[in-house]
Amino acid sequence: MAKNVVVLGTQWGDEGKGKVVDLLTDKATYVVRYQGGHNAGHTLVIDGEKTVLHLIPSGILRENVTCVIGNGVVLSPEALLKESAMLEERGVPVKERLRISEACPLILPFHVELDLAREKARGDKPIGTTGRGIGPAYEDKVSRRGLRVGDLFNPTDFAVKLKEVLEYHNFMLTNYYKVEPVSYEKTLADALAVADILKAMVVDVTDVLDRARKRGDEIMFEGAQGTLLDIDHGTYPYVTSSNTTVGGVATGAGFGPLHLDYVLGIVKAYTTRVGSGPFPTELGCDVGQHLGIKGHEFGATTGRKRRTGWFDAVAMKRAVQINSITGFCLTKLDVLDGLETLSICTGYKHADGTVKDVPPMAADDYELITPVYEEMPGWSENSFGVTEYDNLPQAAKNYIKRLEELTGVPIDIISTGPDRNETIVLRHPFEV
């Protein structure tokens, strides 16, 4: 029987979702993005060749897959064309494989300028956005003044709507942030220039996916960022502007939640975070540097150095609660090779001395907690590139088993390297 599978991050993003999606798409007919924008960075390594995608779903490299960008994604025409050109230069027929919802909010130049101006105005307390206009575009959507892909197909009305929203934002840019206004004429011309290109890819996403489900096609939903960056459930306000959790599938792709069969949570064997915000298990010592260097922990989108820390089972419990995770994919296990001792956070100690196994909701509350650790022996053997579970070091197996016990969820896939072939699949999400 056909399966509909969600693949999402369970930490602060950068868990390795791109590789896993690419690995699993050999059995998928559709791969769907349902939230975020080109602030995501999904890195694929296939036969040693590296590809970084920010907006287009990771399944685009598969001939058998139709990729879909749902209404929950904020779409930058400029970013889409740039990414499409990069792929087409490598022989990938993007226009044949990609479909887009006409309800996608557009990211336009003034959104980018607002994003940059706001981060600068925050001084030494930035949110840590990518500066790509994601948040301002979602704000316009919620405020019901945003322009959508479908608006481009009526140039006269689009010009009027653009003038109104640009006057509003230019007032803020010039009077409050004291920066230059964005040109109406150039913004209009650039936007309308891509209208026909986008129109050729526009479909009714909800209807397409529903028909696919009824035909028995396999559908995969590809999340961006991670659970702990969710606008509602993350470490607010140090979060992204969309719902990165499983609920985003229903709202961002118009796909009924009762039709989802399996939720695969991608989780690193340790923890990383880019930008500002709480990070209870963060390491400022040599071990943290080791994880960062060996794990190549630099953001695929911004190039920023990622903060590193131990595995946080408390945060993962929340991710399991929110997402109804069926199974985990544990990534970057090989980065732990050579460490004598490993630590796992099993609780948060509060100021009153109590220890809780669930995280607080607000970022400020994290300042009052101390992580409680459980130590485990590390391993000196090499796990890099291992493709059979029995060939893993025994201490690595013990570590995996303990993570399963603490989260209450089985680890169905283990990634031991960046290439799609450097993987141990214990249970395939499309086959369970």
From Swiss-Prot:
GTP binds at residues 13-19, 41-43, 306, 332-334, 415-417. Plays an important role in the de novo pathway of purine nucleotide biosynthesis. Catalyzes the first committed step in the biosynthesis of AMP from IMP. The keyword Repeat does not apply. Belongs to the adenylosuccinate synthetase family. This is Adenylosuccinate synthetase. Signal peptide: none annotated. Pfam families: Adenylsucc_synt (PF00709). GO terms for cellular component: cytoplasm. The gene is purA. Mg(2+) binds at D14, G41. Coiled coil: none annotated. It comes from Pseudoalteromonas atlantica (strain T6c / ATCC BAA-1087).
